């Protein structure tokens, strides 16, 4: 964690996941102190519903936002294609669309997730470079 460019903390809308996410964030904060550097981190909402947002998830998101925790803007939606991909291996693109429902939506979701992570990494790099320049000007 101490040398990571980005720490993603997966979170389902479950009480136990919420508690574990808090523990993970606390670990990141301890590592920040130990390494004397900011460690970019964000919560990734997983296995969410494409149709509705549960009360539990809304409450968890509100609590995280109130605590200033960054949440990745893309959620990994609960889809059978993700389960099949993990069970059978290979790639999402290789799944048989006749046997597995929602493959195209899962691919779209996975691409949006990847793009969000790349964007966050770029933003973090730009912030780090700006901080380095600002720190160098005071010397």
Describe the function of each predicted region:
Residues 1-15:
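Inter-motif core of Ras-like GTPase G domains
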Residues 18-37, 46:
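Conserved C-terminal guanine-recognition region of P-loop GTPase G domains, centered on the G4
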Residues 49-52, 60-93:
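Beta-strand-loop-alpha "switch" segments that mediate conformational coupling across diverse proteins
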Residues 85-111:
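Inter-lobe coupling/hinge region of RecA-like P-loop helicase motors
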Residues 13-15, 47-51, 100:
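Short histidine/acidic/glycine/proline-rich micro-motifs that form metal-
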Residues 109-139:
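Charged phosphate-binding loop/patch that engages nucleotide di/tri-phosphates or the phosphate backbone
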Residues 9, 43-45:
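Structural beta-sheet core signal
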């Amino acid at each position: 964690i101490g040398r990571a460019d980005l720490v993603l903390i997966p979170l389902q809308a479950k009480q136990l996941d919420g508690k574990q996410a808090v523990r993970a964030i606390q670990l990141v904060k301890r590592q920040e102190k130990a390494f004397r550097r900011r460690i970019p981190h964000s919560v990734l909402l997983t296995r969410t519903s494409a149709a509705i947002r549960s009360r539990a998830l809304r409450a968890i998101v509100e609590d995280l936002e109130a605590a200033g925790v960054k949440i990745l803007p893309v959620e990994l939606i609960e889809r059978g294609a993700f389960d099949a991909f993990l069970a059978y291996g290979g790639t999402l693109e290789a799944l048989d669309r006749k046997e597995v429902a929602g493959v195209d939506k899962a691919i779209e979701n996975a691409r949006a997730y990847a793009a969000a992570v790349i964007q966050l990494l770029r933003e973090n790099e730009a912030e780090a470079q700006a901080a380095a320049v600002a720190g160098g000007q005071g010397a």
